[in-house]
Amino acid sequence: LSKYFTVAYIPLYTDISFIPGVLNLTYVQNSGAAFSSFEGQQWLFALIFLFFTGLIVWEYFKKKMAFTPFERWCIAAIYGGGLANMVDRLRMGYVVDMIETAFMDFPVFNVADCFITCGCVLLMGHLVLFNKAFWKDKKK
């Protein structure tokens, strides 16, 4: 929904102050990955997305890896954000970005990017802090 409303109501490259001094809404078309790297490589991103989807399915079904509910939520956030961006890439050739930090110089991003980042950080933190199998393998 955030991408739809951005495209429908904010002209391209226009800044709208959302929370003055904190957040702006800025419609940007990003044909690359993070920080606009690898611009125009939509099929590379599709292959990477499919690879990680396959990896998750492999871990879950073939290795009988049991994910905790928290880990499933993290994986769902990562996968959902990736899927949302992938749909944009394949449908339009770019990802709609709209969130700009006004208080620091940082690339414009979108809600899906937030889900991917939060899911990754929380999953890694959870695995390091609470996954006994992670530490058991490292002690050998």
Task: List PLM regions with ranges.
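Alpha-helical transmembrane bundles and membrane-interface segments of multipass inner-membrane proteins
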Residues: 1-140
